[in-house]
Amino acid sequence: SEDYTIRTAMLEQRFVCGDISLASELSEKLWNNLFEGTAKDFISAKLKERENRHEKHGQRYMVEPNVKEGKGGLRDLQSLYWIAKYVYKTQRISDLVELNVFRSDEHEQFDKAEEFLWAVRCQMHHLSDRAIEQLSFDLQVEVATAMGYKDSHARRAVEIFMQDYFRHATRVGDLT
């Protein structure tokens, strides 16, 4: 398990500044000496991590969902990206459309869900002044307001917001 956490961190490495040839050499050595031929094991490890996360943090339809670790959350999207990157050596999720792994509408759903979930998570952190992942009842109302949701004649803003949340979480579940 720890080995695959480290592999995932290494998978995310990128050149920021310094010696570009050294960064290229690191990347080449990682792919040739560490990642090559281990895709099946990496996928199994990531799927097991997901299963354990879902057991611990619950289903997407929990009334107070975990936006990061829960089913249909950000970690599910990240896991899909990491698997794609490991198997196909992609740099962007959009590359999966060109590889015929995703249809363009699935890529669009991925992007919209990722943008929405990150916006929710950032609002949660901002409003609570700390890193918090559980979207509690009280926080749901505040996040809905902060994200511009308004009451309609038939429904409260928080209900509309949570319906959007569950719609995105369901799409993430469908994609992953």
Regions from the language model: what does each represent?
Residues S1-T176:
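A nucleotide- and high-energy phosphate-metabolite-utilizing enzyme signature
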